[in-house]
């Protein structure tokens, strides 16, 4: 699963979805062989391997698709803008939630997250996406950008909560100390992973940028 996760981005870049299909098929066949011939293997291990490969390897390819769709300087700016939406969502949610938060968003999964912080993060996400609409190669109005900002904000929160659940199931409080108060670097990465493919799907599906792979 880890090997496949590492291979997904270069395979996507070199061979597109045909290569991804071949890699995914190879992964499933390899896991089936391992499950059949290794007596200590469990179904849950097979499922976990597939999940890790798709979540950590396939989903981040969304940024690659977006970058390839908009060549040159503006492609990098577009990807950076999407990332900024995730970062500002996290920062505003943390700052406003810490200062004004009183209503818990998901107390069993992530006790520190609040509805006040959630709303602040969504506003920040919408603001960034409205700025993204101003990038010349992107064909997107402000209403559409606002909707995309909300959806990507939700995707980021979902990825963040999922990572919090993973940590709790593993008995880990924080996934790092690089960013104090934010739960660790993995919180930022998981939000980014979730937003990566969602943003690509929205931009391509909405006809905002051309699909090239």
Predicted regions and their residues:
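Juxtamembrane boundary at the C-terminal end of a transmembrane helix
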Residues: 201-213
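A short, terminal or domain-edge coil/loop segment
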Residues: 49-58, 161-166, 196-199
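Acidic (Asp/Glu-rich) catalytic motifs at the cytosolic membrane interface
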Residues: 84-102, 106, 115, 119, ...
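Membrane-embedded alpha-helical bundles of polytopic integral membrane proteins
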Residues: 1-151
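Repeat-unit-sized solenoid/scaffold elements
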Residues: 129, 193-201
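Short, conserved aromatic-histidine micro-motifs
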Residues: 141-145, 182-183, 189, 207-209
């Amino acid at each position: 699963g880890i090997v496949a996760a590492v291979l997904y981005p270069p395979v996507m870049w070199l061979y597109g979805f045909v290569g991804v299909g071949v890699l995914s098929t190879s992964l499933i066949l390899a896991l089936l062989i391992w499950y059949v011939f290794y007596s200590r293997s469990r179904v849950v291990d097979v499922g976990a391997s597939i999940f890790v490969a798709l979540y950590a390897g396939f989903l981040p390819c969304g940024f690659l698709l977006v970058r390839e769709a908009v060549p040159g300087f503006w492609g990098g700016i577009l990807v950076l803008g999407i990332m900024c939406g995730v970062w500002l969502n996290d920062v505003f949610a943390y700052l406003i939630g810490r200062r004004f938060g009183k209503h818990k968003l998901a107390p069993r999964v992530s006790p520190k997250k609040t509805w006040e912080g959630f709303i602040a993060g969504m506003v920040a996400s919408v603001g960034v996406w409205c700025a993204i609409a101003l990038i010349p190669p992107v064909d997107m109005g402000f209403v559409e950008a606002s909707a995309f900002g909300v959806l990507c904000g939700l995707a980021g929160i979902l990825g963040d909560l999922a990572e919090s659940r993973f940590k709790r199931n593993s008995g880990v409080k924080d996934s790092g100390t690089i960013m104090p108060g934010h739960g660790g670097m993995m919180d930022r990465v998981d939000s980014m992973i979730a937003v990566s493919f969602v943003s690509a799907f929205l931009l391509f599906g909405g006809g905002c940028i051309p699909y090239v792979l």
